[in-house]
Every structure is written in structure tokens, then in C-alpha cells.
Amino acid sequence: MITFADLAEPAPGAERCVDRQLWLACAGGMCTVPPVGAAVYYFPQGHAEHALGLAAPELSAARVPALVPCRVASVRYMADPDTDEVFARIRLVPLRAAEDGDVEEDGAAAGEEHEKPASFAKTLTQSDANNGGGFSVPRYCAETIFPRLDYAADPPVQTVVAKDVHGVAWNFRHIYRGTPRRHLLTTGWSTFVNQKKLVAGDSIVFLRGDGGDLHVGIRRAKRGFCGGGGGAEEASLPGWDQYGGLMRGNASPCAAAKGRGKVRAEDLVEAARLANGGQPFEVVYYPRASTPEFCVRAAAVRAAMRVQWCPGMRFKMAFETEDSSRISWFMGTVASVQVADPIRWPQSPWRLLQVTWDEPDLLQNVKRVSPWLVELVSSMPAINLSSFSPPRKKPRILAYPEFPFEGQLLNPAFPPNPLAHGHHHYHHNHPSFFPFPDVSAPAGIQGARHAQFGPSLSDLHLTHLQSSLMYPGLRRPDHVGPTSIPPPRISTDLTMGSSPPARALSMGAKKPDDAKPPGLMLFGQRILTERQMSLSGTTSPAATGNSSLNWNTEKGASEGSGSGVIQNSPTDNTSSERLQWFRENSTVSELGLEPGQCKVFIESDTVGRNLDLSSLASFEQLYGRLSEMFCIDSAELRSRVLYRGATGEVRHAGDEPFSEFIKLARRLTILTDAGSDNLGS
């Protein structure tokens, strides 16, 4: 049996290790390295990005899994002998299927938290880096990091001895002089600058160890851009490291190549091969290389992937300046949830979130982030409540024993605990890692939750939902056998009285002939939908329910064969499907709309905005108002606005006189693609 002690033994003649505290100070305040014994996930995709993507084709050809659960066997903190750039050699032991449960136990890592020692970093100015000049020491550093200076002497002066990352001692003359008086390093500083080849923009780090010893380290500045391809996008943020210590990514390949030149493609392929085969392996990590950590604490990954990420979620993320002098939080919004590289890594959560920022100018090149690097602020997409009608009392829905409620939107296709389901078996048996939780909830609760926000989630067209809201890998679970009849569904949205049973009866389940049509009750009085009221004008009250039921049943029969609610077929943005979606969703409740008002929807949106048509006099004014509301050129709107006519067919705005249009239109839909102009038959 291989033990951690055996794995941790360094080979004879191994490179000299750096003091851990000094290493962390040089790496940056937000850099984290998992301690020995910690459970981590190793991401080969992130490792390839760390190596400038040199071995990505070889990894994809070898069918390396998206992530491998491991335990840290040893960590060696080291520094480049020429540049002083710090890096770590991390030895990992993959966990087998029988040990997958151990990934939850991270107790060994919790005990290795150390108090950070006093340290200070300063970016060198042109004066500091001049040959023959001195170093201006900030007062905080001189009084808290350096040994105490005897201010009674004239002038106050002392010799400061500091050891670098290689253990070499450097002597500096520390003096307090000038007008105004300031702390300076004079004699010995020029030698240090010349030997270390420091330039303006580099940072110097002073640290006082636990024993009182003084240490000095270096953080090299990134040297511009070199163009050419690489594994990451080029950064153009002056002063800001694109991913800080938390997520140093999307920086210039040329700038990062200085520290990552030793991450060879063959080493990357070998590490991935050993990891896939369940053998111990070693990786080299450069914390200043402007890419995220690819050995991530398992607890952080699992916690992040339990969140049901969807567009519109608000989050915050920490960034630090390139010299690691300060850390700031930036707010952002999830724009989409999709795999970053579906060809090579189709099941990888690495950089799963495509994001937009509240301050896009500062973070213009940070387009994708991994879920475990952000902190969720709001799980509900931002909704403009001003466009909704005033809250109304929620009528209760009649209970029908033959229609059991189903308030569940959709279930994930991935197990809640992939490790417990044999996540890592080697030999390429690696299911996707998306442990979203079960989101089932009582129908009454979900109905109340969504009553004042328009259509309930259970009434939305699921193929539309999969393509626009959820991660593409999610699908409706196939609980129904080939010959069994699934349980029918009924809408849990208490504000929708005109939902056709075509969506309520899933997979063509038939409703008994003697069943009463669904209705709404408010204070003991039945509430009729507009369609039921229109039918009651020409038929007797006793026949009203049957007429409505027959109409809905016929409509359900015509749509049953193409029900996209349960089908797992991929969603196509064709004209016919868009028209079908418009027809299925055009029966939005008109309760609360005054005469001359309507709801306006962007195609595939489930939340509309109110528009007073009575205040408009022509289609030109209509297009102008819509252009202001949605920031779309009015000329493009002429062929993109659809509405439902009196006879139920979908028409273009402008097919009827504007006076008739005002009377009939209760829902407008703006197509996002001009090519979907085909209304079909």
C-alpha cells in the first residue's frame, strides 16, 4: 500500500524548498495551495491551460476525464533559480471508486490553517529601480516589518539583513533622513537590483518570519504582449491582473510563458495519463502564471456545482491588482451556462459560466469563470417589477383527483453525488460532474411563489427552457416506460385560467369524458376565462364547460404528437418551432389588462412588459415605442412584430387597420431573428 509518507519523500539531490510563508507572500494574497491530505479535484483542462494549451489535442485524443478526485500527498514550495519566480510541486494520489466517499472528508486540510505573518509589498518606481539609487521604504514597512530603528541616534541608521527565496542573505543600510524625513535603503540596494535584474513595475516583498527573521521576495511584472496564439486570451487591463490571485486567467500568453516555460507538454500528458490510470502523479503550479488553480479543493467544487446555475444570477468575485497590493470585489451577472470547450471537454465544469460585468471596461477580457470562483449574491434573475400589474388575490384552484399536481420543473440528468455513483472508475468510465440538487417542491408552494410573476415554471415549454435558461446537458428524466402512461400534469399557476389541457395532459393522456373543465374559484364564485366568457355568449351556461373542453381537447389532439414538453429531441431555432412556441404561449392570462393594453414579449422570454396601445395613433408610433422599450431599430421591427388575431391565427402587425389592431391585440411578440418571418400554415 502506498502511503503519503512514502510519496512525500523527495528524491536525492532535489531542489531546495522555499520557506512556505515567503512563498505565499511572493505568490500573492489570494493564492491558495491545498495542504497535504486535502481532497481536491484535478482538472486536466485547467492544467492544459496552465501550459498554454500545448497538449490539449493529445489529452482529448487520450479521452482523459474532465476531472479526477485526488488527495494531496505532498507539496514542495520552490523558486526558479534565475528569476526567483515561485512555483509548487504538488503530488496527487487519485481516489479509486471505493475511496470516492473520502473526498467528502477534508478534516486534514482544516487543521493546516496558519496565521499569516507580517508582510509588505511595494511596486518599484523608476527611482527605486535606478542603478546606483536607493529604495524608498514606506513608513508602515519600516516600523512593522524591519527591526526597530534607534531614532535617538543622529542620524538613525542600521544594517538590515534579509534572506531571499534561495536562502541568500542580503545586507541593506537602512537610514532615516531627508526633508521631509523618510526611510531609505542605500548601500547594498543597487547590488540587489542588479543581481535580480529588477525594473520599474516589479514588486518587492518584505516579510518577517515567525522567528523574527527578515525575508525578501520578488514579484515580476508582466512584460507587455507578444501576439500569436496561445491557450488564453490576451489581457489589456492596465494595472489589473485579469484573474488576480483567485483566478489568474486570460492574461497574455507571452507574459505568462516566462513562468510556465517549464510546464512541458509531455509532462502534462504524462500527468493526465497517470491520473486516468489511478497512479500517483506530480504537477507543477506557477501561481503568478495568470491562470486559475487546476487542483481545486473538492468541497469548494461540490458546493458550487450544487447550485442550479442559470442566466440572470448575480454574483461577486474578488480580484487583486497585478502587484497584489490590494483586493477588490466586482459584481457580475451570469449570461449563459455552457461548456467552454464542448469538443475536447464536453462534460467539464471548467469555466462553465459565461458572464457579464457591471464594470465591463475593467474586466473586458474576463468572459468565462468557473462556478467555484464566484460568490452567489442573488439566485433569482433580476426582474423589473414596474412592468407588472398590481398584485391580485390568488384564487384557489379546484382539486381534481384524476390530475395529480406536479410542481417540479425538471430534474437533472446527473446524480446528486457523482462520487457515490462511481464517478471515478478509471478506464474512461467518467460520467459528467454536475450534481445539481433535486428541485421538487409542493405544487401549492411553487404556485404561490410564481403567482405574481406571470406564468409558472411548470407551464413553460421545456424545450424552450432548456435552450434558453438551463445548462444544455439537463434534460427531462425518462421515467416513463415505452408502454406505460405517465401521470398527467396540471398547471400550478394560479393566475392562468386559459392554459390549454394540451400541456396539462402530458404524452397524450386522455381526460375522462365526464370530467369538469378546470376552473378557478374566488370567494366561492367561479372565475371564467375570457374564452369561456366568449363562448357563454352563444351557448347556454350548461354547455359552456363542454364547449371549452371540446375545443381544448381538439387542440390537445392536434398538438399531442409534437409535444416538446417530454421529448428529449434537441431544440432547433426554426421558424415553425418559433411559431409553435408563440401559439402555445399566446394564451397568457389577460386578467388585469385594461382595454387597449397588451403585453409585449421578446421571443423566448417568459416575462412581458405592459404597453398602452390606446395612447398610440399608428403603427409608426407603435414601432417607435417598441424601439425605445427594447433598444431595437424601428426599421427592423416592421417585419418582426407578431400578434394573435380575433380568429386565433398569428399575424404580422400591420395586416389589419390600426383601429382593429388595438381592439384585438393583447400579446405582441418580437422575433429575435428576421429569418423567422415564415408564419407557416
Curated annotation (Swiss-Prot):
<dbReference type="Pfam" id="PF06507">
    <property type="entry name" value="ARF_AD"/>
</dbReference>
<protein>
    <recommendedName>
        <fullName>Auxin response factor 8</fullName>
    </recommendedName>
</protein>
<dbReference type="InterPro" id="IPR003340">
    <property type="entry name" value="B3_DNA-bd"/>
</dbReference>
<dbReference type="Pfam" id="PF02362">
    <property type="entry name" value="B3"/>
</dbReference>
<dbReference type="GO" id="GO:0006355">
    <property type="term" value="P:regulation of DNA-templated transcription"/>
</dbReference>
<keyword id="KW-0238">DNA-binding</keyword>
<dbReference type="InterPro" id="IPR053793">
    <property type="entry name" value="PB1-like"/>
</dbReference>
<dbReference type="GO" id="GO:0003677">
    <property type="term" value="F:DNA binding"/>
</dbReference>
<dbReference type="GO" id="GO:0009734">
    <property type="term" value="P:auxin-activated signaling pathway"/>
</dbReference>
<dbReference type="InterPro" id="IPR044835">
    <property type="entry name" value="ARF_plant"/>
</dbReference>
<keyword id="KW-0804">Transcription</keyword>
<feature type="compositionally biased region" description="Polar residues">
    <location>
        <begin position="564"/>
        <end position="577"/>
    </location>
</feature>
<keyword id="KW-0539">Nucleus</keyword>
<comment type="similarity">
    <text>Belongs to the ARF family.</text>
</comment>
<dbReference type="InterPro" id="IPR010525">
    <property type="entry name" value="ARF_dom"/>
</dbReference>
<comment type="subunit">
    <text>Homodimers and heterodimers.</text>
</comment>
<feature type="region of interest" description="Disordered">
    <location>
        <begin position="474"/>
        <end position="518"/>
    </location>
</feature>
<feature type="compositionally biased region" description="Polar residues">
    <location>
        <begin position="534"/>
        <end position="555"/>
    </location>
</feature>
<dbReference type="InterPro" id="IPR015300">
    <property type="entry name" value="DNA-bd_pseudobarrel_sf"/>
</dbReference>
<comment type="function">
    <text>Auxin response factors (ARFs) are transcriptional factors that bind specifically to the DNA sequence 5'-TGTCTC-3' found in the auxin-responsive promoter elements (AuxREs).</text>
</comment>
<dbReference type="GO" id="GO:0005634">
    <property type="term" value="C:nucleus"/>
</dbReference>
<feature type="region of interest" description="Disordered">
    <location>
        <begin position="534"/>
        <end position="577"/>
    </location>
</feature>
<keyword id="KW-0805">Transcription regulation</keyword>
<keyword id="KW-0927">Auxin signaling pathway</keyword>
<feature type="domain" description="PB1">
    <location>
        <begin position="595"/>
        <end position="675"/>
    </location>
</feature>
<feature type="DNA-binding region" description="TF-B3">
    <location>
        <begin position="120"/>
        <end position="222"/>
    </location>
</feature>
